[in-house]
């Protein structure tokens, strides 16, 4: 077994105080996202999306956040993917944003709601053309005999859609994750980290400090 117990560091970039918290957690998330982007972090919109299968087995994968507002967090995916199939059976999900260089994390619990075709199409048409074509090519989470099969299909579809717009695949969609709780974590000295959790009660948010 590889021993990693001596890998550690101190957290000293600043604290998080109750008096500094807005009543709406999305306001704090917007501030932290802006600061993550301004710090030029690698993939600041990358989030870990966790779902659970019918046996209670959790699965995680990195997905890019594409939009957020007071209603929640939006991402897009292949509707035949494992994550989409699991969401169809159990729409309770969690999201996690690991902004390590800023010594920050944000964890979200909520329910995923499918977006309308109009909303999906609006975003799909903003994607680069090669990305639109790739959406047609990949049967996400299915087994492949070789990468060449995938590449061959890509170039075949690229030739097919050489002229004109790429249509939206019927098996491609998106989700809005409506949060029931959002936790903000800020690293602190001596492992005395600051953790605050916002919990939704109807239209109001309750704020609690959690022990590190």
Curated annotation (Swiss-Prot):
Assembly information from the UniProt record: Homodimer.
Obligatory cofactor(s): FMN
E.C. code: 1.4.3.5
Amino acids binding FMN: 61-66, 76-77, 82-83, 105, 140-141, 185, 195
Top-level enzyme category: oxidoreductase
SUPFAM superfamilies the UniProt entry points to: FMN-binding split barrel (SSF50475)
Record-given protein name: Pyridoxine/pyridoxamine 5'-phosphate oxidase
Pfam families, per database record: PNP_phzG_C (PF10590), PNPOx_N (PF01243)
Keywords noted in UniProt: Flavoprotein, FMN, Oxidoreductase, Pyridoxine biosynthesis
């Amino acid at each position: 077994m590889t021993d990693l117990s001596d890998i550690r560091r101190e957290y000293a970039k600043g604290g998080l105080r109750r008096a500094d918290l807005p009543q709406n957690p999305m306001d704090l998330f917007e501030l932290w996202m802006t600061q993550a982007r301004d710090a030029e972090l690698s993939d600041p919109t990358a989030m870990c999306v966790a779902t659970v299968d019918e046996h209670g087995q959790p699965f995680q994968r990195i997905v890019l956040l594409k939009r957020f507002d007071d209603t929640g967090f939006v991402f897009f995916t292949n509707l035949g993917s494992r994550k989409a199939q699991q969401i169809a059976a159990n729409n309770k999900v969690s999201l996690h944003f690991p902004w390590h260089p800023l010594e920050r994390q944000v964890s979200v619990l909520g329910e995923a709601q499918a977006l309308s075709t109009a909303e999906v199409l609006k975003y799909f048409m903003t994607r680069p053309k090669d990305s639109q074509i790739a959406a047609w090519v990949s049967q996400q989470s299915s087994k492949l005999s070789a990468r060449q099969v995938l590449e061959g299909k890509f170039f075949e579809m690229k030739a097919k859609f050489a002229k004109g717009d790429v249509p939206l695949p019927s098996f491609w969609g998106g989700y809005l994750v409506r949060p029931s709780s959002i936790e903000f974590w800020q690293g602190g000295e001596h492992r005395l980290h600051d953790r605050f959790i916002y919990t939704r009660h109807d239209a109001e948010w309750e704020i609690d400090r959690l022990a590190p």
